[in-house]
């Protein structure tokens, strides 16, 4: 067998979820390209400003920005971004973005807006962790991602995507009861 090389795997530099004003909802950086928090915030502000006037509501858009490929999509009042080096395959990065936005949609049960995202921030951060580890892309299928994240929050008797609302409410009641009994 040949040696595994991190350079041979598609990778991303960061995954950003910003609100409609460009403020952070959930972000994760996998690269030292932005060494300080100030440089990260400056990058987020500039990429948000550059993409603000585009119409990325129905489909993801791809742009080259400061030597990086940035794939982005807007859903309600949330702006999803995935950044990669300019040597990465745009279609793979677009698949990462699609997997991220779709899995967030599944986990938030279609209520993809800032308030709901902040209330379920733990699920969104777990979602990012299931998609990318150390910059290496692990998974892009939204159902698989949401299923893995949901197994941490759901009893696992049924796949997350197949649960009915009554099952979800029952599960939520169980978790609430358990937390109150602790």
From Swiss-Prot:
It is a peripheral membrane protein. Its main location: cytoplasm. CDD domains: Zeta-COP (cd14829). Coiled coil: none annotated. It holds the Pfam family Clat_adaptor_s. It is found in: Cytoplasm; Golgi apparatus membrane; Cytoplasmic vesicle, COPI-coated vesicle membrane. Keywords: Cytoplasm, Cytoplasmic vesicle, ER-Golgi transport, Golgi apparatus, Membrane, Protein transport, Transport. GO terms for biological process: intra-Golgi vesicle-mediated transport; intracellular protein transport; retrograde vesicle-mediated transport, Golgi to endoplasmic reticulum. InterPro entries: AP_mu_sigma_su, Coatomer_zeta, Longin-like_dom_sf. One of its GO terms (cellular component) is Golgi membrane. Oligomeric complex that consists of at least the alpha, beta, beta', gamma, delta, epsilon and zeta subunits. Belongs to the adaptor complexes small subunit family. The coatomer is a cytosolic protein complex that binds to dilysine motifs and reversibly associates with Golgi non-clathrin-coated vesicles, which further mediate biosynthetic protein transport from the ER, via the Golgi up to the trans Golgi network. Coatomer complex is required for budding from Golgi membranes, and is essential for the retrograde Golgi-to-ER transport of dilysine-tagged proteins. The zeta subunit may be involved in regulating the coat assembly and, hence, the rate of biosynthetic protein transport due to its association-dissociation properties with the coatomer complex. This is Coatomer subunit zeta-2. It comes from Oryza sativa subsp. japonica (Rice).
């Amino acid at each position: 067998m040949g040696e595994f090389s991190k350079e041979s795997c598609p990778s991303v530099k960061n995954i950003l979820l910003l609100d409609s004003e460009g403020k952070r909802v959930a972000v994760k950086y996998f690269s030292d390209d932005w060494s300080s928090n100030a440089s990260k915030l400056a990058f987020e502000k500039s990429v948000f400003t550059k993409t603000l006037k585009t119409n990325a509501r129905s489909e993801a858009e791809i742009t080259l920005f400061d030597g990086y490929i940035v794939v982005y999509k807007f859903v309600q009042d949330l702006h999803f971004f995935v950044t990669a080096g300019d040597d990465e395959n745009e279609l793979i990065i677009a698949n990462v973005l699609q997997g991220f936005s779709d899995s967030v949609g599944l986990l938030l049960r279609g209520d993809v807006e800032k308030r709901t995202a902040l209330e379920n921030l733990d699920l969104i951060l777990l979602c990012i962790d299931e998609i990318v580890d150390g910059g290496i892309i692990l998974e892009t299928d939204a159902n698989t991602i949401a299923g893995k994240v949901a197994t941490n929050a759901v009893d696992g008797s049924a796949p997350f995507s197949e649960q009915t609302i009554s099952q979800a409410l029952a599960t939520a009641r169980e978790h609430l009861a358990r937390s109150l009994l602790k």
